[in-house]
């Protein structure tokens, strides 16, 4: 999509993609944001600074070496003061009800709540399955069958106690920790969300997001 900057800093109508993501968070009442930054991460800090002019308080957790998605969470842990916190990918934009995740975490007494989304062909992804009560029973499960199904949407609400179980080093949340937590019997659950979703990792989606911003689908 872009080669001179981190993907989340790709410009959309003169603003980095990540500004649209943070705006959505601020609108949802989230005003304390920790950026887990690696490649050209100083570009993120130079743009957002302390975050105040964007309506939030910003901290930056730098990675000396790539730590993977779970390793990055552990590395950012030194800035986390709350007992629970949201985690999301900076190169995806997903409109969800964040208070619903909080309610779910409390009502099912979960260690982590996550958002799933429905796709027309689940064989292209790893499938994530919830039971009728909302508990996660399978994650990243491969299927050859080209059919409709649910996959990981990439937004999580996690308890600090769960973060403390992530080992040091390069660790993947999706491939290492979530499957391990399921095996260990941790309480993971979620809901399927049908809000606007886009991942700008592919050029067509990047162009689509630009168009959606121009047409005020996203503001």
Please give the residue ranges for each predicted region.
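A generic structural signal for residues located within well-ordered alpha-helices
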Residues: 13, 68-71, 153, 173
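Conserved beta-loop-beta/alpha segment of the NTase-like Rossmann-fold superfamily
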Residues: 45-46, 50-132, 165-167
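Conserved beta-strand scaffold positions in the cores of enzyme catalytic domains, especially
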Residues: 9, 60, 112, 188-190
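N-terminal glycine-rich phosphate-binding loop and ensuing alpha1 helix
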Residues: 1-45
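Catalytic-core segments of class I nucleotidyltransferases/pyrophosphorylases
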Residues: 84-86, 93, 99-106, 120, ...
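Residues at the starts of beta-strands that form the adenosine-phosphate
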Residues: 31-33, 57, 111, 187
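A structural signal for short hydrophobic beta-strand segments in well-ordered beta-sheet cores
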Residues: 9, 128-130, 178, 190
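Active-site phosphate/pyrophosphate- and oxyanion-stabilizing loops and adjacent acidic/basic residues
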Residues: 42, 74, 179
């Amino acid at each position: 999509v872009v080669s001179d900057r981190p993907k989340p800093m790709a410009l959309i109508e003169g603003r980095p993609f990540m500004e649209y993501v943070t705006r959505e968070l601020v609108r949802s009442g989230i005003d304390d944001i920790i950026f887990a930054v690696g490649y050209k991460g100083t570009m993120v800090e130079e743009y957002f600074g302390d975050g105040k002019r964007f309506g939030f308080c910003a901290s930056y957790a730098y990675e000396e070496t790539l730590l993977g998605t779970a390793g990055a969470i552990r590395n950012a842990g030194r800035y986390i003061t709350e007992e629970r916190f949201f985690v999301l990918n900076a190169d995806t934009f997903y409109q969800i009800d964040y208070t619903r995740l909080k309610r779910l975490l409390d009502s099912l007494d979960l260690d982590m709540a996550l958002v799933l989304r429905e796709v027309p062909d689940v064989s292209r992804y790893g499938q994530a399955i919830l039971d009728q009560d909302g508990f996660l029973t399978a994650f990243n499960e491969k299927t050859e069958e080209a059919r409709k199904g649910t996959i990981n949407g990439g937004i999580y609400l996690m308890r600090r106690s769960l973060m403390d179980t992530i080992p040091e080093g390069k660790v993947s949340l999706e491939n290492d920790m979530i499957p391990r937590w399921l095996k260990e019997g941790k309480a993971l659950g979620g809901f399927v969300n049908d809000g606007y979703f886009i991942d700008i990792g592919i050029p067509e989606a990047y162009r689509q997001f630009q168009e959606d911003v121009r047409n005020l689908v996203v503001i």
